[in-house]
Amino acid sequence: MSSSGTLSNYYVDSLIGHEGDEVFAARFGPPGPGTQGRPAGVADGPAAATAEFASCSFAPKSSVFSASWSAVAAQPPAAATMSGLYHPYVSPPPLAAAEPGRYVRSWMEPLPGFPGGAGGGGGSGGGGGGGPGPVPSPGGPANGRHYGIKPETGAAPAPAAASTSSSSSTSSSSSSKRTECSAARESQGSGGPEFPCNSFLRDKAAAATGNGPGVGIGTGPGAVGSSEPSACSDHPSPGCSLKEEEKQPPQPPQQQLDPNNPAANWIHARSTRKKRCPYTKYQTLELEKEFLFNMYLTRDRRYEVARILNLTERQVKIWFQNRRMKMKKMSKEKCPKGD
């Protein structure tokens, strides 16, 4: 029993191994000031176990470990040993140090014009909020965006817009082809003239007072009168038509509606019902002939009549319905119930 117990203890001890402490210390924690690798003479090592149980009749399995086990135990500090296997993380160099003719941008970096990445900056290489904001370049869009979004008219320009950066200029120049349409659209929207709806009304009021911007360069009234027709002829606008209407004498109103007379208001009220579709004499005559021939039209005949008279089938059907009701009413009037 004692020999089997020692065999099982040695076999389990050799399978478990004690290199886990060094590996985990190198991976997950920095080495301490006095920490060193395990020396070759540690009592719990497999070499010591072999020396202790040398009188055992069972030979140890030497194929489990390589011949360099003793050399691995006597090592310098674990951090220096594992540096060849696990390379430490080195932060990438900032984008400003890259080649001037090359555009480098990480896929994790937010867009310069994106609201969440404002202030991240391609020049600083940081995540966001640490470096300066995006700086527009002459070739890029005005607000540094790389996608076509209508800019806000009320937003003030950023204070960092006056500074210049090599990284932002390279990024703007490389993406100028993609943002050509959007930049042109934004420049037109921001710098183009705006024409409000009531601009011609203001011009009209200024021309009436004689002190507005619409007055010509001349100071006398003759100069004003001579400059207005030429301006209207060159640039026609609704204001010109209003001025022409003012020059014409006012016409008296055709009829004054009495607000206290509901009959007059009802006569001149605008009808909400659908307008009637009067038929021409030729269409009415042909429909009457067809009605005298047959009071009820088949579908094929109704289609033919509608095609000949340039009407719709619905119009022909409704006309025949009304004509039958009219004939029924006339027959009732000719034959009273008393007879």
Swiss-Prot record:
It holds the Pfam family Homeodomain. InterPro entries: Abd-B_homeobox_TF, HD, HD_metazoa, Homeobox_CS, Homeodomain-like_sf, Hox9_activation_N. Residues 114-198, 211-263 are annotated as: Disordered. Its main location: nucleus. Residues 155-176 have a biased composition (Low complexity). GO terms for molecular function: DNA binding; DNA-binding transcription factor activity; DNA-binding transcription repressor activity, RNA polymerase II-specific; RNA polymerase II transcription regulatory region sequence-specific DNA binding. This is Homeobox protein Hox-D9. The lineage of its organism: Eukaryota, Metazoa, Chordata, Craniata, Vertebrata. The gene is Hoxd9.
